[in-house]
Amino acid sequence: MLLEETEPPNQTLDHVLSWLEDSVSLSPLPGFDDSYLLHEFDGSQTWEWDQTQDPEHGFIQSYSQDLSAAYVGCEATNLEVVTEAPSIDLDLPPEIQQPNDQSRKRSHDGFLEAQQVKKSARSKRKAIKSSEKSSKDGNKEGRWAEKLLNPCALAITASNSSRVQHYLCVLSELASSSGDANRRLAAFGLRALQHHLSSSSVSSSFWPVFTFASAEVKMFQKTLLKFYEVSPWFALPNNMANSAILQILAQDPKDKKDLHIIDIGVSHGMQWPTLLEALSCRLEGPPPRVRITVISDLTADIPFSVGPPGYNYGSQLLGFARSLKINLQISVLDKLQLIDTSPHENLIVCAQFRLHHLKHSINDERGETLKAVRSLRPKGVVLCENNGECSSSADFAAGFSKKLEYVWKFLDSTSSGFKEENSEERKLMEGEATKVLMNAGDMNEGKEKWYERMREAGFFVEAFEEDAVDGAKSLLRKYDNNWEIRMEDGDTFAGLMWKGEAVSFCSLWK
């Protein structure tokens, strides 16, 4: 698929603005305004878990036969109507000791009662203070959903059917798709555990989840706009990537080569209007031609990667480029190996939140892919990935626990970003994010391991310049103050944090 314009006519932005029912200004780069929603290419896919590859296959096969019958005692609870909070108190105030006979004799003046009131007040203040601290610093004390889901996963691994049934019943009582982050995590986790224990048809009928591939085009468009407005989850990495591209081009301002960007990402075009606008405002002007080659693998069920059928941002992005007098070409490929490069262009690769889906244990597909990228001789590579601990995917319970940590940060942050309790946009983003719980092959890794892979592939890390760092910090001030960016290792590592816990990282390589 190829879209190209060689002689851009004079045209205003009215056609772009009228296409949008809404707009959002993120100012990802100093002086520029990203107000244009882009479309995604056609495509949808399904994923089916292969139970025969799981170490607990024997137990699961026998247990799933009785799963429906086992739920007779639990199925009366509707996930949507649970409103009472779970009776989990991790910071209980100390009990007040009853006075003995001698103390009662001295209590006629109310002294003891006053002391009891003071103790009770102090206990309440202590509990509130502890709760606030837990919420602020990301402490796990208040995260009760994981304390139910993780033991259930361990019970599945141990083939302990009675404990599995116990935890599933408790979770079904507490889970809710419209409650707080704990209740929603309980609901998504419960669904994932059921999926692991039974066929996908049974688990999906238990509680339907909305994803990008099943969304209507207008709803998908509206959701992307809203998410970029309320969360830096992808907005900040996109910002850093665009700044890195400009940084690379600025190192040789007299270079008049074309710019070729390989997009291995999940932005659905949201990233590029700001970059195009920045290119048009350079003193030396934009490159003679800008090529964007999108690697769109519709066969991989990677969270956030595949939009709804009929969603195509190509024509809208071309129209925007024409208005800026930029000669833009967009190509879509399904394999990295099919890329056509030229010595007369500056090749830059943007790999964002897609490579962690590749295998990394027996067959190191991640390392092989990075070596394939190196063989293209790019002028720069921007790598943005989830920054999380890795655990062997062969251990279901350990891998599930790490995925729960990732999903908790997403759900907790969307609770702050989306103020409406039943926001449809939030449900769509969360449904897409929590696909990771159902995907046996989707494993994160820490930035140290990714840095090791990049060096083994022949890349050298490069520091972000001051403008890139300042632009990222300026963008982050638009969001909840629990978000922060940490620059480490001589500004070669930009880490996005939520309540002090690592979410993702962005890095630049040459």
UniProtKB/Swiss-Prot annotation:
* Annotated spans, Leucine repeat I (LRI): 143-205
UniProt keywords (A-Z) are: Nucleus, Transcription, Transcription regulation
Q: Which GO terms describe its cellular component?
A: nucleus
Q: In what ranges is there compositional bias, type Basic residues? A: 119-128
Q: Name one Pfam family in it.
A: GRAS
Q: Where is this region: PFYRE?
A: 347-435
Q: Which superkingdom heads the taxonomic lineage of this protein's source? A: Eukaryota
PANTHER family this protein is in?
OSJNBA0084A10.13 PROTEIN-RELATED
Question: Could you tell me which residues belong to the region SAW?
Answer: 438-510
Region described as Disordered = 90-142
Q: What is this protein called?
A: Scarecrow-like protein 29
Locations listed in the record:
Nucleus
Described function: Probable transcription factor involved in plant development.
State the Gene Ontology BP annotations.
Answer: hormone biosynthetic process; regulation of DNA-templated transcription; regulation of secondary shoot formation
Q: In which tissues is it expressed?
A: Expressed in seedlings, roots and flowers.
The UniProt entry's sequence similarity note says: Belongs to the GRAS family.
Bias (Basic and acidic residues) ranges: 102-111, 129-142
Q: Does the keyword Ribosomal protein apply?
A: no
Tell me the segments the record calls region Leucine repeat II (LRII).
Answer: 312-337
For this chain the motif VHIID maps to 259-263
Quote the PROSITE patterns the UniProt record gives. Answer: GRAS (PS50985)
